[in-house]
Amino acid sequence: MHLYDEGFEPPKACAEWCRARPFELQVLDDGVTVDLQWWNNHLDDAGHEIRLRGRNLDGRIVGTGTAVVQRNDLRLGSDLIDADHEGLGLLFLCAAWRSAHPRRKAVRRFPDVRDVRTPKGRHPLAKIKGVLDYCAKTKGLPDTSRQTWSGWPDTPGVGVPLMATYLWAVEARTDTGPAQMLDQYGVSTLVHEGWLEDPSVADFTVRRYHRYVELLNTWAGLMSTRPELVEMWLVDRWHARVVEARDGSQATPRLF
């Protein structure tokens, strides 16, 4: 464990919240409403052979309009993905889920994953597909520490939070534990609670991400819960602070 993290224990409210919630219901069933038309139109315009789907209120799979995508759908072989490349289809489903989440710090943005510096004769999607395939096959990140300043592989159009979501979806592991989602709201809560680290997730290096994952797993172990629940509490906690600051006395009461 990082020297600065020794003795940094989870807040009591975090422990109470996590212990009171089942992983399957709270995490895996975490659903959002995705505008399939928007995403599929952008996929068509970009020339991708990918179609995203969702479920209607009856639970049936649909491919048009708005539909629900649950966190449990973020996996290879998902029924909600029809794609010529499984990893790339999953990446776009992760992007759609993240951007539609009402409590996470994300905006709807279509990732341009083409490599604009592609050498002649090489497909512009070869780089991103190669990284995604490697992560899915090996359950880890390629070692690019000598090629990029951050340690992250070169993934055109894909930021750290989206990459972390993909790593969680393919059940990847890091040097410090299972990969976890990374959200600005969650890190803001950690810093507010006393974590001594740079608060910007966009600037997270791989080493900093490993430290973050280790902290979540350590807290989960102390509370006999799952790190995904810890991450969710951190995100929801900051979202609750934002709502309270915005709405004041009109804010919905929360267990914090």
Residue ranges and their predicted role:
Residues 76-84, 149-153, 172, 176, ...:
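Short, charged/polar micro-motifs that form catalytic or ligand-binding hotspots
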Residues 91-95, 166, 230-234:
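Short alpha-helical scaffolding segments that buttress acidic/His motifs in well-ordered protein cores
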Residues 97-104, 169-172, 192:
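Amphipathic alpha-helical interaction surfaces
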Residues 79-86, 91-155:
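Helix-hairpin-helix/helix-loop-helix acidic hairpins
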Residues 20-83, 95-96, 103, 107, ...:
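A structured, charge-rich N-terminal accessory region that forms the first stable segment of a protein
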Residues 1-59, 171-256:
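C-terminal accessory module of base-excision DNA glycosylases/AP lyases that mediates lesion recognition
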Residues 163-169:
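Short hydrophobic alpha-helical segments that form membrane-spanning helices or hydrophobic packing faces
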